[in-house]
Design a protein with these regions (language model features):
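Glycine-rich phosphate-binding loop signature in dinucleotide/nucleotide-binding domains
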Residues: 1, 95-98, 150-156
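Helix-loop "lid/cap" segments that line or gate small-molecule binding pockets
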Residues: 28-29, 48-60, 114, 146-147
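Conserved SAM-binding loop
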Residues: 14, 82, 100, 135, ...
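Active-site neighborhood of HAD-like aspartate-dependent phosphohydrolases
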Residues: 1-44, 56
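Short, acidic loop-to-helix structural element flanking the phosphoryl-transfer center
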Residues: 75-102, 108-112, 140
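Substrate-recognition "cap/lid" segment bordering the active-site pocket of phosphatases
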Residues: 79, 107-173
Length: 176
């Protein structure tokens, strides 16, 4: 077995959050600046930290904007679900003795609030959130932190994500 560790991104990979993220961001921008930006123009925000997305949108007070975005996100929680087949996949990987982990752009608080309620976090031994590293995707730092904490060889790690930021992060870390 070439890989011992299978590491996942969360949003767009394990859980379907696209609608919730984009619409709550759209609502946040409108509330802060009055600008109405189509969701299609906000897709760049998928896969990077909320703070980085807000900076790209030239929002000055990102701390307040994150609070507002989190509040707005709660209006869309009914639109978030685990992708079909994920629970079965995780069970199968566990039965095959893979060690599973997470590398996400979510903060630890967002991870706890947005992901843990789905009841699948127990499948993952090592979890790296945005506040665990100073640099974020597409920088290699989050995956390298996973390699460090899991005490493994980077060649035994496979990273699965859905965005260009995920693939670039893995590439920058020398991970498949």
């Amino acid at each position: 077995m070439k890989y011992k560790h299978i590491v996942f991104d969360i949003d767009g990979t394990l859980i379907d959050t696209e609608y919730a993220v984009l619409h709550s961001l759209q609502e946040t921008i409108k509330g802060l600046s009055g600008r109405e930006i189509p969701c299609s123009e906000l897709r760049f925000a998928l896969g990077i930290t909320g703070t980085d997305a807000l900076k790209k949108l030239e929002i000055k007070d990102t701390s307040y904007a994150i609070e507002l975005w989190d509040k707005n996100m709660r209006n869309y929680t009914n639109n978030i679900k685990v992708f079909d087949g994920i629970v079965e996949l995780l069970k199968n990987l566990l039965s095959l003795d893979y060690e599973m982990g997470i590398v996400t752009s979510k903060t630890r608080e967002e991870f706890t609030h947005d992901f843990c309620p789905f009841g699948i976090s127990h499948y993952f031994k090592t979890i790296i959130c945005a506040d665990d590293t100073q640099e974020h995707k597409p920088n290699a730092a989050p995956i390298l932190k996973y390699v460090e904490l899991s005490k493994t060889d980077h060649r035994k790690v496979l990273y699965i994500g859905d965005s260009k930021y995920d693939s670039k992060c893995a590439e920058n870390a020398g991970i498949d």
